[in-house]
Amino acid sequence: MAAAQISAEEMEELREAFTKVDVDGNGHISTDELNALFKAANLPLPGYRVREIIQEISRTMDLNQDGKITFDEFAKVVHDLKSSEVAKTFRKAINKKEGICSVAGTSEQSGTQHSYSEEEKVAFVNWVNKALEKDPDCQHVLPMDPSTDDLFTAVGDGIVLCKMINLSVPDTIDERTINKKKLTPFTIQENLNLALNSASAIGCHVVNIGAEDLKEGRQHLVLGLLWQVIKIGLFADIEISRNEALIALLRDGESLEDLVKLSPEELLLRWANYHLEEAGCPKINNFSSDIKDSKAYYNILNQVAPKRDEEGIPAIPIDISGIREKDDLKRAECMLEQADRLGCRQFVTATDVVRGNPKLNLAYVANLFNKYPALKKPENQDIDWSSIEGETREERTFRNWMNSLGVNPRVNHLYVDLADALVIFQLYEKIKVPVDWDKVNKPPYPKLGSNMKKLENCNYAVELGKKEAKFSLVGIAGQDLNEGNRTLTLALLWQLMRRYTLNILEDLGDGQKIIDETIVQWVNETLTQAGKGTISGFKDGSISSSMPVLDLIDAIQPGSIRYDLLKAEDLTDEKKLNNAKYAISMARKIGARVYALPEDLVEVKPKMVMTVFACLMARGMRRI
């Protein structure tokens, strides 16, 4: 893998550049995206030269000639060709996209430039303005003016970010923990800690973003984080266990399992094509070049608009006469006027449609789907409904943890997306277990024998776990990972997460070996010094009330816990959950990156309880 020869700092730059070109975020760069990049960059080059450069980039980067450039291919070639004319032109294009504002970086290296998309800023500002327009706690910064830099100052106190996180994943942050009045630099810092650690807990990749970056309104970091939060909210219901009507998208000869494997982006594309097919119109392959003429959008709007066939829902007729408009921009504007009648004009301008901005068009379609899916759950199909299971809390915690570390591709379905072990290898690297990437088969896999390639990866992943990581993997074989055996996959993931957590403590404690007893001892010493009660271990029944966790937070940061908000006696499950929500949010607020959920405390789940105390111990040790 390219990682072996490239410094961490350069790797981060390459990752940022890749993300800028891979605008639909699907983990690879297509020719469409290269064309869009050079068109938007507006470089002073004749058209034939741009075409030659794109061909050269495709030829040299697409190492296996499958029409897709993966991050590994991208990193290797950009690194190897650093001084070539093609690579220089490519980098220039990345930095000069029209509608992309370049901002001098703050690192010591001269010449560091970061950029952000003006179109994205406008889209996100309008979305946040609408989402929070009635929230009394945000009136001091809303509405923001999309034509200015309002957004970058508005996020500076953390309140807007906390609110947006709660809109995307309700109940992530306990409102009682957000500092809202008479803000000081210290209480602002707490809000930003709370926002960042909560974003991490819902699966945002925030490893390189600090509270200071948000306070100072670093544009590319603010937009990057906000997009992740918005996208998680938009995609929340594009998932079969939460929306069984999606089964209408099953094609002939497909099983339910085939549909479950699709990512939210793939499901959205299939949904769009389902409605286009119903309308007797040509299908689309993407939300960039194929939607530029707005015709597909017109037909989808016409299909999903209410027709007065459901009781109590008034019809909203769509005027599609604008589809005959000769000018692309005018046609797009007419189409958006019709979308506005459905209350679905968000995220794109007519220009964004005509330019085929993949990220904003994806958001536009996701929002349309959420409001008007226009799908009916099939009545007579022979479907095993019991096989549609939503993910458990434990599975969601592991998935969010992995995604917060920036694994690529993003994990949407725990077992399906680990079947080739690529994500597991990345997690091994995060816990300092060396991976020989020459032994790893990388996608795209051949049509014939693809599962054998994935199985070889899984066998190597288990071998690494046993020999290098010294994990207890008795009875676990590569086949179990490849086939998505729940119990055995979770056993490996737990050991990865545990080692990751303990490594943080060992790094803070000069490499001293940390075991469960070390954490319990530290917790009890800290509680005793603060005059508070102790615990017997991670199964202690008192943890169900969350009081030991709250007491520890108050011992680490004296005076931080408002005990008047808590219930300590006659505890019902509801009161316990209320305490636990407050405890988890307070842990994040004082700077602990906690992934566990409130229910884990109420039910005293020892594994997740251990991670809560370990993260608090890491936060406590940082005071020294």
Curated annotation (Swiss-Prot):
InterPro entries: Actinin_actin-bd_CS (IPR001589), CH_dom (IPR001715), CH_dom_sf (IPR036872), EF-hand-dom_pair (IPR011992), EF_Hand_1_Ca_BS (IPR018247), EF_hand_dom (IPR002048), Fimbrin/Plastin (IPR039959). The keyword Transcription does not apply. The keyword tRNA-binding does not apply. PROSITE patterns: ACTININ_1, ACTININ_2, CH, EF_HAND_1, EF_HAND_2. Residues 118-234, 262-373, 392-501, 513-621 form the Calponin-homology (CH) domain. Monomer. It is found in: Cytoplasm, Cytoskeleton; Cell junction; Cell projection; Cell projection, Ruffle membrane. One of its GO terms (biological process) is actin filament network formation. The lineage of its organism: Eukaryota, Metazoa, Chordata, Craniata, Vertebrata. Ca(2+) 1 binds at residues 22, 24, 26, 28, 33. GO terms for molecular function: actin filament binding; calcium ion binding. It is a peripheral membrane protein. Keywords: Actin-binding, Calcium, Cell junction, Cell membrane, Cell projection, Cytoplasm, Cytoskeleton, Membrane, Metal-binding, Repeat. This is Plastin-2.
